[in-house]
From Swiss-Prot:
Identification of the protein by name: ATP-dependent kinase YFH7
Enzyme Commission (EC) number: 2.7.1.-
Disulfide bonds: none
Coiled coil: none
Family stated for the protein in its record: Belongs to the YFH7 family.
GO molecular function per UniProt: ATP binding; kinase activity
Gene3D superfamilies membership: P-loop containing nucleotide triphosphate hydrolases
């Protein structure tokens, strides 16, 4: 079993070491289907946030949100802007770019939009269209810390790769839609274009620094330091999740807020050495604030886990069908991950048998 408390300590240690140079740190957590990566990511996130909530309960009124950000950065200034007529055409096509659904070289583009909460934002879309959109909220009204419930302030946030599954409608437009649906979960059935763009956005926010008029000492805790260095000018970033009942992405399910100082990215292909995936590691590693974990587990253990999950999700009607689906798709993806793991020295291997 994985010691998630030890992982939490390692992540907080990295944040403590990098807090003068990085606004946030990132964690990559990779494993084959059924390896437990989602559960580990959720536990890790919960442990860190609970630790911070305990600190806040013992140190009321410690939080400060200021605008002393260096550098002031436009997160998507280099992206092409869609014109209103182009946005209208995209919407008419059910939020898709019909000619680019399989184009892994398609460059993400931006346009003005609204979040699901009706807030003004910049939407970033790629070959998966609006189903896999990233939405960056407009920074306007200052945060009133006094009106925030302390237990609502979370410094860690998970970002599952699952939200970047290409929608079923998108897969319908593939040259071979039958194979695309059968092999859903393979590398080509994710919007790797926009996930890489998300990593570029996160890297930019990571490299921002917030100056503080407080002098920190060697005895200052990491929670004390980050509580004094929240920035008003870091925008909230909304990313999609995945609805297993609907079998499609869910817009704006996760929010990487200005209070998020630790982003836990989990998924199958975040260390994959092919197409857009191969650029993710370097994009985040170049910030100097990254931890990378690969979960190792025997395929015999994952087969039963995944077969039961397929049954519970309604993808199959019997456990035997679940095992067959695992062997014809999930097992192939797991072996593909192991055969195409990027070659870097700082991947920490952990077992979850």
């Amino acid at each position: 079993m994985v010691d998630t408390h030890k992982l939490a300590d390692d992540v907080l240690h990295l944040l403590d070491n990098r807090i003068e140079d990085n606004y946030r740190v990132c964690v990559i957590l990779v494993g084959s289907p059924g390896s437990g990566k989602s559960t580990i990511a959720e536990e890790l996130c919960q442990i860190i946030n609970e630790k911070y909530h305990t600190f806040l309960s013992e140190h009321p009124n410690v939080i400060e949100v200021n605008d002393r950000l260096k550098p002031m950065v436009n997160l998507v200034d280099s992206l092409k802007t869609l014109q209103p007529n182009e946005v209208a055409e995209m919407i008419e096509n059910q939020g898709l770019f019909k000619d680019h659904v399989e184009d892994v070289n398609f460059q993400p583009i931006k346009y003005s939009a609204l979040t699901s909460n009706n807030e003004e934002c910049t939407a970033v879309v790629a070959r998966g269209g609006t189903a896999n959109a990233i939405r960056i909220a407009t920074v306007d009204n200052p945060v009133n810390v006094n009106k925030l419930a302390q237990d609502s302030i979370n410094i860690a946030q998970i970002v599952p790769m699952d939200g970047f599954h290409l929608s079923r409608r998108c897969l319908d437009l593939f040259k071979d839609p039958q194979t695309a649906h059968k092999r859903r979960g393979s590398p080509s059935t994710f919007d790797s274009n926009n996930f890489l763009q998300l990593c570029k956005i996160l890297a930019k926010t990571s490299l921002c620094k917030v100056s503080s008029h407080h002098k920190f000492y060697s005895t200052s805790s990491v929670f004390e330091k980050l509580s004094k260095t929240f920035s008003q000018t870091i925008p909230d970033i909304f990313v999609p999740g995945f609805n297993h009942a609907l079998k499609d992405p869910t817009p704006d399910q996760y929010c990487i807020s200005k209070f998020t100082r630790i982003v836990i990215l989990e998924g199958l292909y975040l260390l994959y050495d092919q197409e857009n995936w191969k650029k993710i590691y370097k994009t985040l590693a170049d910030t100097g604030a990254l931890l990378v974990y690969k979960i190792d587990i025997d395929y015999e253990a994952t087969e039963e886990r995944v077969a039961k999950r397929h049954l519970q999700s309604g993808l199959v009607t019997t456990i035997a069908e679940g095992r067959e689906k695992f062997r014809s798709n999930d097992l192939l993806n797991g072996r593909d991950i192991d055969n195409h793991l990027i070659k870097v020295d700082n991947i920490v291997h952990i077992r979850n048998d």
